[in-house]
Amino acid sequence: MKKNAPKSFEEALSRLESLTQAMQGEMPLEDALAAYQEGNELVIYCQTKLAQVEQKLQVLDADGLKELNLESDE
């Protein structure tokens, strides 16, 4: 992330939601491309943070080392 790197996962997610809403409206092509690029960087940031948290959870559960299932059965 180059400029304005998010300080947290929640901040990145909030920015992604804002970009998504903006792109659903009327937006000049150049702005849409910039928003898409920023969104892609934010997705990578969020995926990295989630992978780090998953890894930490596995370490914390070292006694039984169960696989983490983040999907609900609902």
From Swiss-Prot:
GO terms for cellular component: cytosol; exodeoxyribonuclease VII complex. Keywords: Cytoplasm, Exonuclease, Hydrolase, Nuclease. One of its GO terms (molecular function) is exodeoxyribonuclease VII activity. GO terms for biological process: DNA catabolic process. Signal peptide: none annotated. It is found in: Cytoplasm. It is an enzyme of class 3 (hydrolase). It catalyses: Exonucleolytic cleavage in either 5'- to 3'- or 3'- to 5'-direction to yield nucleoside 5'-phosphates. The keyword Nuclease applies. Its EC number is 3.1.11.6. Its main location: cytoplasm. It comes from the Bacteria. Heterooligomer composed of large and small subunits. PANTHER family: EXODEOXYRIBONUCLEASE 7 SMALL SUBUNIT (PTHR34137:SF1). Belongs to the XseB family. Bidirectionally degrades single-stranded DNA into large acid-insoluble oligonucleotides, which are then degraded further into small acid-soluble oligonucleotides. This is Exodeoxyribonuclease 7 small subunit. The lineage of its organism: Bacteria, Pseudomonadati, Pseudomonadota, Betaproteobacteria, Neisseriales.
